[in-house]
UniProtKB/Swiss-Prot annotation:
One of its GO terms (cellular component) is SREBP-SCAP-Insig complex. The record marks 115 as: Required for the recognition of 25-hydroxycholesterol. It comes from Pongo abelii (Sumatran orangutan). The chain crosses the membrane at residues 29-51, 71-88, 104-126, 130-148, 154-175, 190-207. The keyword Transmembrane helix applies. This is Insulin-induced gene 2 protein. Pfam families: INSIG.
Length: 225
């Protein structure tokens, strides 16, 4: 073999770190898309429950009533759901407190069912006054957190989400960008923060479960390599 002859370089292989980062980025995008569509679906369902207050079940215009809100509301709810669902596991990792309480899909589905039930109660049950409605929904929302979360970070994020979402919603209403069909604006404000709090806890649980599944898949792939 001649001295000047050099071997042609073979195909470059990505290191395990680059491969892991790429895999995590793709999984993060997939989780965001899944959370977005879950948020859009829940927004449509919960909007239907609010519209159905004091109305017979499945009226003729039920399909039209699902999309009676402003067109941009479901996408905004989906975007917020994606942000919340991705934020919860990130906060857990940052605090070094991995959430391990009731980490299975059956628990997550029960949490979603309870959240829908809380929203259904706010739409269907008649209370004597708005204070009684607020206290009842607050107790139910905190009960949802205690049953399916019990983390300090989850409670803190839920309160922050409820406060921020309520303020943004009120600003939109005051500026005429969005309006409620209910003539009793005080009634709406009495249940809105509780619904946002419960929704934040619910989407956080979904996001945590998706993140835990991603960690399992990445761990299995790295073990195989």
């Amino acid at each position: 073999m001649a001295e000047g002859e050099t071997k042609s370089p073979g195909p470059k292989k990505c290191g395990p770190y680059i491969s892991s980062v790429t895999s995590q980025s793709v999984n993060l995008m997939i989780r965001g898309v899944v959370l977005f569509f879950i948020g859009v679906f829940l927004a449509l369902v919960l909007n239907l429950l609010q519209i159905q207050r004091n109305v017979t079940l499945f009226p003729p215009d039920v399909i039209a009533s699902i999309f009676s809100s402003a067109w941009w509301v479901p996408p905004c709810c989906g975007t917020a759901s994606a942000v919340i669902g991705l934020l919860y596991p990130c906060i857990d990792r940052h605090l070094g407190e991995p959430h391990k309480f009731k980490r299975e899909w059956s628990s997550v589905m029960r949490c979603v069912a309870v959240f829908v039930g809380i929203n259904h109660a706010s739409a269907k049950v008649d209370f004597d006054n708005n204070i009684q409605l607020s206290l009842t929904l607050a107790a139910l929302s905190i009960g949802l957190w205690w049953t399916f979360d019990r983390s300090r970070s989850g409670f803190g994020l839920g309160v922050g989400i409820a406060f921020l979402a309520t303020v943004v919603t009120q600003l939109l209403v005051y500026n005429g960008v969005y309006q409620y069909t209910s003539p009793d604006f005080l009634y709406v404000r009495s249940w809105l923060p509780c619904i946002f709090f419960a929704g934040g806890i619910t989407m956080g649980n979904i996001g945590r479960q998706l993140a835990m599944y991603e960690c399992k898949v990445i761990a299995e792939k790295s073990h195989q390599e």
